[in-house]
Protein backbone atom coordinates (compact mmCIF):
# COMPACT_ATOMS: atom_id res chain seq x y z
CA UNK A 1 0.00 0.00 0.00
CA UNK A 2 1.39 3.43 -1.12
CA UNK A 3 1.96 6.10 1.44
CA UNK A 4 0.27 9.50 1.41
CA UNK A 5 3.58 11.29 0.79
CA UNK A 6 4.19 9.19 -2.27
CA UNK A 7 0.75 9.95 -3.61
CA UNK A 8 1.17 13.66 -2.98
CA UNK A 9 4.48 13.68 -4.74
CA UNK A 10 2.94 11.85 -7.67
CA UNK A 11 0.12 14.36 -7.89
CA UNK A 12 2.41 17.34 -7.89
CA UNK A 13 4.73 15.93 -10.47
CA UNK A 14 4.48 16.64 -14.20
CA UNK A 15 6.22 14.89 -16.98
CA UNK A 16 8.26 16.38 -19.69
CA UNK A 17 8.26 15.13 -23.21
CA UNK A 18 11.55 13.38 -22.46
CA UNK A 19 10.06 11.56 -19.49
CA UNK A 20 11.76 13.74 -16.90
CA UNK A 21 9.33 14.93 -14.29
CA UNK A 22 9.15 18.64 -13.42
CA UNK A 23 7.69 19.63 -10.16
CA UNK A 24 5.18 22.42 -9.92
CA UNK A 25 6.95 25.71 -9.19
CA UNK A 26 9.86 24.76 -11.38
CA UNK A 27 7.97 25.34 -14.70
CA UNK A 28 8.59 29.13 -14.80
CA UNK A 29 12.27 28.61 -14.47
CA UNK A 30 12.55 26.36 -17.50
CA UNK A 31 14.75 27.60 -20.40
CA UNK A 32 11.93 27.45 -22.94
CA UNK A 33 9.56 29.67 -20.99
CA UNK A 34 12.28 32.17 -20.22
CA UNK A 35 13.23 32.46 -23.86
CA UNK A 36 9.63 32.93 -24.84
CA UNK A 37 9.24 35.75 -22.37
CA UNK A 38 12.45 37.33 -23.59
CA UNK A 39 11.23 37.17 -27.16
CA UNK A 40 7.88 38.67 -26.23
CA UNK A 41 9.55 41.46 -24.29
CA UNK A 42 11.93 42.12 -27.16
CA UNK A 43 9.01 42.23 -29.59
CA UNK A 44 7.19 44.68 -27.36
CA UNK A 45 10.31 46.81 -27.11
CA UNK A 46 10.68 46.75 -30.88
CA UNK A 47 7.07 47.83 -31.32
CA UNK A 48 7.52 50.64 -28.82
CA UNK A 49 10.67 51.79 -30.57
CA UNK A 50 8.97 51.66 -33.95
CA UNK A 51 6.08 53.71 -32.60
CA UNK A 52 8.53 56.19 -31.13
CA UNK A 53 10.43 56.34 -34.42
CA UNK A 54 7.21 56.80 -36.39
CA UNK A 55 6.04 59.52 -34.04
CA UNK A 56 9.41 61.23 -34.32
CA UNK A 57 9.29 60.97 -38.10
CA UNK A 58 5.76 62.34 -38.12
CA UNK A 59 6.82 65.21 -35.89
CA UNK A 60 9.76 65.91 -38.17
CA UNK A 61 7.48 65.80 -41.21
CA UNK A 62 5.07 68.15 -39.50
CA UNK A 63 7.95 70.44 -38.62
CA UNK A 64 9.23 70.30 -42.20
CA UNK A 65 5.77 71.06 -43.54
CA UNK A 66 5.50 73.93 -41.12
CA UNK A 67 8.88 75.20 -42.28
CA UNK A 68 7.81 74.96 -45.91
CA UNK A 69 4.54 76.71 -45.12
CA UNK A 70 6.41 79.40 -43.21
CA UNK A 71 8.85 79.84 -46.07
CA UNK A 72 5.96 80.21 -48.51
CA UNK A 73 4.26 82.69 -46.19
CA UNK A 74 7.47 84.60 -45.68
CA UNK A 75 8.06 84.72 -49.44
CA UNK A 76 4.48 85.90 -49.98
CA UNK A 77 4.82 88.61 -47.35
CA UNK A 78 8.14 89.71 -48.82
CA UNK A 79 6.54 90.01 -52.27
CA UNK A 80 3.66 92.04 -50.83
CA UNK A 81 6.06 94.31 -48.95
CA UNK A 82 8.17 94.81 -52.07
CA UNK A 83 5.09 95.55 -54.18
CA UNK A 84 3.82 98.05 -51.62
CA UNK A 85 7.25 99.69 -51.39
CA UNK A 86 7.45 99.97 -55.16
CA UNK A 87 3.93 101.37 -55.29
CA UNK A 88 4.69 103.79 -52.48
CA UNK A 89 7.91 104.86 -54.17
CA UNK A 90 6.05 105.43 -57.43
CA UNK A 91 3.38 107.45 -55.65
CA UNK A 92 5.97 109.44 -53.73
CA UNK A 93 7.92 110.20 -56.90
CA UNK A 94 4.71 111.13 -58.69
CA UNK A 95 3.63 113.32 -55.78
CA UNK A 96 7.07 114.86 -55.61
CA UNK A 97 7.08 115.63 -59.32
CA UNK A 98 3.56 117.00 -59.04
CA UNK A 99 4.55 119.15 -56.08
CA UNK A 100 7.67 120.36 -57.86
CA UNK A 101 5.69 121.18 -60.98
CA UNK A 102 2.97 122.76 -58.92
CA UNK A 103 5.53 124.80 -57.03
CA UNK A 104 6.97 126.09 -60.28
CA UNK A 105 3.50 126.92 -61.57
CA UNK A 106 2.73 128.62 -58.26
CA UNK A 107 5.73 130.88 -58.80
CA UNK A 108 4.11 132.40 -61.89
CA UNK A 109 0.67 132.48 -60.29
CA UNK A 110 1.96 134.01 -57.08
CA UNK A 111 3.94 136.69 -58.88
CA UNK A 112 0.96 137.58 -61.06
CA UNK A 113 -1.35 137.81 -58.05
CA UNK A 114 1.12 139.95 -56.13
CA UNK A 115 1.71 142.28 -59.08
CA UNK A 116 -2.00 142.71 -59.68
CA UNK A 117 -3.19 142.94 -56.09
CA UNK A 118 -0.32 145.01 -54.74
CA UNK A 119 0.19 147.37 -57.65
CA UNK A 120 -1.84 147.30 -60.87
CA UNK A 121 -5.32 147.28 -59.37
CA UNK A 122 -4.30 150.33 -57.32
CA UNK A 123 -2.65 152.46 -60.01
CA UNK A 124 -4.47 151.60 -63.26
CA UNK A 125 -7.89 152.91 -62.19
CA UNK A 126 -6.15 156.21 -61.27
CA UNK A 127 -4.01 156.45 -64.41
CA UNK A 128 -6.27 158.68 -66.49
CA UNK A 129 -6.67 161.10 -63.59
CA UNK A 130 -2.90 161.28 -63.14
CA UNK A 131 -2.52 162.07 -66.85
CA UNK A 132 -5.09 164.86 -66.67
CA UNK A 133 -3.27 166.36 -63.68
CA UNK A 134 0.03 166.60 -65.56
CA UNK A 135 0.51 169.99 -67.20
CA UNK A 136 3.54 168.67 -69.05
CA UNK A 137 2.05 165.51 -70.52
CA UNK A 138 -1.75 165.83 -70.52
CA UNK A 139 -1.76 166.75 -74.22
CA UNK A 140 1.28 164.73 -75.24
CA UNK A 141 0.51 161.21 -74.09
CA UNK A 142 0.15 159.04 -77.18
CA UNK A 143 -2.02 156.37 -75.55
CA UNK A 144 -3.72 156.71 -72.20
CA UNK A 145 -2.64 153.29 -71.03
CA UNK A 146 0.29 151.66 -69.27
CA UNK A 147 2.53 149.59 -71.54
CA UNK A 148 3.96 146.73 -69.47
CA UNK A 149 7.14 145.21 -70.92
CA UNK A 150 7.61 141.44 -70.62
CA UNK A 151 11.05 140.45 -71.97
CA UNK A 152 11.43 136.74 -72.68
CA UNK A 153 14.69 136.47 -70.72
CA UNK A 154 13.14 138.30 -67.73
CA UNK A 155 16.15 140.62 -67.73
CA UNK A 156 15.17 144.21 -67.02
CA UNK A 157 17.32 147.31 -67.35
CA UNK A 158 17.26 149.99 -64.68
CA UNK A 159 16.88 152.49 -67.50
CA UNK A 160 14.86 151.47 -70.58
CA UNK A 161 17.17 153.63 -72.68
CA UNK A 162 19.91 151.05 -71.99
CA UNK A 163 17.81 148.46 -73.80
CA UNK A 164 16.86 150.78 -76.67
CA UNK A 165 18.56 154.17 -76.99
CA UNK A 166 15.57 155.60 -78.85
CA UNK A 167 13.35 155.25 -75.78
CA UNK A 168 14.26 158.21 -73.59
CA UNK A 169 12.90 159.14 -70.19
CA UNK A 170 10.90 162.38 -70.41
CA UNK A 171 9.57 162.72 -66.88
CA UNK A 172 7.02 161.33 -64.41
CA UNK A 173 3.28 161.69 -64.01
CA UNK A 174 1.98 163.11 -60.71
CA UNK A 175 2.26 160.45 -58.03
CA UNK A 176 -0.62 158.60 -56.43
CA UNK A 177 -0.50 158.48 -52.64
CA UNK A 178 -2.27 155.47 -51.18
CA UNK A 179 -2.40 154.14 -47.63
CA UNK A 180 -1.14 150.60 -47.94
CA UNK A 181 0.12 147.96 -45.52
CA UNK A 182 0.45 150.35 -42.62
CA UNK A 183 2.29 152.95 -44.72
CA UNK A 184 0.59 156.33 -44.89
CA UNK A 185 0.48 157.96 -48.31
CA UNK A 186 2.66 155.40 -49.99
CA UNK A 187 3.87 156.85 -53.29
CA UNK A 188 3.17 155.28 -56.71
CA UNK A 189 4.22 156.99 -59.93
CA UNK A 190 4.70 156.26 -63.63
CA UNK A 191 7.47 157.30 -66.00
CA UNK A 192 6.79 158.80 -69.42
CA UNK A 193 9.21 157.93 -72.23
CA UNK A 194 9.65 159.76 -75.50
CA UNK A 195 10.37 158.14 -78.86
CA UNK A 196 11.20 160.18 -81.96
CA UNK A 197 10.39 158.32 -85.21
CA UNK A 198 11.97 158.48 -87.63
CA UNK A 199 14.84 160.46 -86.16
CA UNK A 200 16.22 162.74 -88.84
CA UNK A 201 19.83 163.95 -88.76
CA UNK A 202 18.72 167.22 -87.24
CA UNK A 203 16.95 165.36 -84.43
CA UNK A 204 13.46 166.12 -85.67
CA UNK A 205 10.72 163.62 -86.36
CA UNK A 206 7.36 162.51 -85.08
CA UNK A 207 7.32 162.32 -81.30
CA UNK A 208 5.52 159.68 -79.28
CA UNK A 209 5.06 159.69 -75.53
CA UNK A 210 4.34 156.36 -73.86
CA UNK A 211 3.76 155.46 -70.25
CA UNK A 212 5.94 152.37 -70.17
CA UNK A 213 7.72 150.23 -67.58
CA UNK A 214 8.93 146.68 -67.05
CA UNK A 215 6.84 144.13 -65.20
CA UNK A 216 9.01 144.16 -62.08
CA UNK A 217 8.09 140.58 -60.94
CA UNK A 218 10.10 139.29 -63.90
CA UNK A 219 13.21 140.44 -62.04
CA UNK A 220 12.38 137.75 -59.46
CA UNK A 221 12.14 135.04 -62.13
CA UNK A 222 15.44 136.19 -63.60
CA UNK A 223 17.17 136.04 -60.21
CA UNK A 224 15.70 132.57 -59.56
CA UNK A 225 17.07 131.28 -62.87
CA UNK A 226 20.55 132.40 -61.78
CA UNK A 227 20.25 131.01 -58.25
CA UNK A 228 21.14 127.30 -58.15
CA UNK A 229 18.94 126.44 -55.16
CA UNK A 230 15.84 127.73 -56.97
CA UNK A 231 16.27 124.97 -59.61
CA UNK A 232 14.66 127.09 -62.32
CA UNK A 233 16.27 126.42 -65.69
CA UNK A 234 16.24 128.96 -68.50
CA UNK A 235 13.63 127.01 -70.54
CA UNK A 236 11.41 126.72 -67.45
CA UNK A 237 11.88 130.43 -66.80
CA UNK A 238 10.77 131.23 -70.35
CA UNK A 239 7.70 129.09 -69.77
CA UNK A 240 7.01 130.91 -66.50
CA UNK A 241 6.87 134.22 -68.38
CA UNK A 242 4.03 132.82 -70.49
CA UNK A 243 2.21 131.52 -67.41
CA UNK A 244 2.72 134.86 -65.66
CA UNK A 245 1.32 136.75 -68.64
CA UNK A 246 -1.63 134.37 -68.91
CA UNK A 247 -2.53 134.66 -65.23
CA UNK A 248 -2.03 138.43 -65.17
CA UNK A 249 -4.30 138.89 -68.19
CA UNK A 250 -6.94 136.75 -66.50
CA UNK A 251 -6.80 138.82 -63.32
CA UNK A 252 -6.87 142.16 -65.13
CA UNK A 253 -9.79 141.19 -67.33
CA UNK A 254 -11.74 139.93 -64.33
CA UNK A 255 -11.23 143.27 -62.63
CA UNK A 256 -14.58 144.29 -64.15
CA UNK A 257 -16.14 142.35 -61.27
CA UNK A 258 -14.70 144.80 -58.73
CA UNK A 259 -17.67 147.20 -59.04
CA UNK A 260 -15.67 149.71 -61.07
CA UNK A 261 -13.35 150.72 -58.26
CA UNK A 262 -10.52 148.54 -59.53
CA UNK A 263 -11.57 148.18 -63.16
CA UNK A 264 -8.34 147.93 -65.17
CA UNK A 265 -9.73 147.10 -68.60
CA UNK A 266 -8.48 149.26 -71.45
CA UNK A 267 -5.87 150.88 -69.22
CA UNK A 268 -2.95 148.55 -69.89
CA UNK A 269 -1.24 146.57 -72.61
CA UNK A 270 1.08 143.63 -72.02
CA UNK A 271 4.05 143.69 -74.40
CA UNK A 272 5.97 140.42 -74.62
CA UNK A 273 9.09 140.40 -76.77
CA UNK A 274 12.44 138.72 -77.43
CA UNK A 275 15.25 141.18 -76.75
CA UNK A 276 17.53 139.48 -79.27
CA UNK A 277 15.12 140.07 -82.13
CA UNK A 278 12.81 142.94 -81.13
CA UNK A 279 13.42 146.57 -80.25
CA UNK A 280 11.19 148.29 -77.72
CA UNK A 281 10.66 151.47 -79.77
CA UNK A 282 9.57 149.51 -82.85
CA UNK A 283 7.19 147.36 -80.83
CA UNK A 284 5.50 150.28 -79.07
CA UNK A 285 4.95 152.28 -82.23
CA UNK A 286 3.70 149.19 -84.08
CA UNK A 287 1.23 148.52 -81.26
CA UNK A 288 0.06 152.14 -81.37
CA UNK A 289 -0.37 152.14 -85.16
CA UNK A 290 -2.23 148.82 -85.15
CA UNK A 291 -4.60 150.06 -82.45
CA UNK A 292 -5.31 153.24 -84.43
CA UNK A 293 -5.87 151.24 -87.61
CA UNK A 294 -8.36 148.99 -85.85
CA UNK A 295 -10.07 152.05 -84.38
CA UNK A 296 -10.38 153.73 -87.77
CA UNK A 297 -11.82 150.57 -89.31
CA UNK A 298 -14.35 150.33 -86.49
CA UNK A 299 -15.41 153.93 -87.05
CA UNK A 300 -15.85 153.32 -90.77
CA UNK A 301 -18.04 150.31 -90.07
CA UNK A 302 -20.16 152.34 -87.66
CA UNK A 303 -20.93 155.09 -90.25
CA UNK A 304 -24.48 154.49 -91.56
CA UNK A 305 -24.82 153.90 -95.31
CA UNK A 306 -26.65 156.78 -97.04
From Swiss-Prot:
Keywords: Immunity, Innate immunity, Nucleotide-binding. GO terms for cellular component: autophagosome; endoplasmic reticulum membrane. One of its GO terms (biological process) is reticulophagy. 2',3'-cGAMP binds at residues 119, 180, 186. The keyword Nucleotide-binding applies. Residues 1-50 are annotated as: Disordered. One of its GO terms (molecular function) is 2',3'-cyclic GMP-AMP binding. Facilitator of innate immune signaling that acts as a sensor of second messenger signals produced by cyclic GMP-AMP synthase-like receptors (cGLRs) and promotes the production of type I interferon. Innate immune response is triggered in response to nucleotides from viruses and bacteria delivered to the cytoplasm. Acts by binding cyclic dinucleotides: recognizes and binds 2'-3' linked cGAMP (2'-3'-cGAMP), a second messengers produced by cGLRs in response to nucleotides in the cytosol, such as double-stranded RNA (dsRNA). Belongs to the STING family. This is Stimulator of interferon genes protein 5. The gene is STING5.
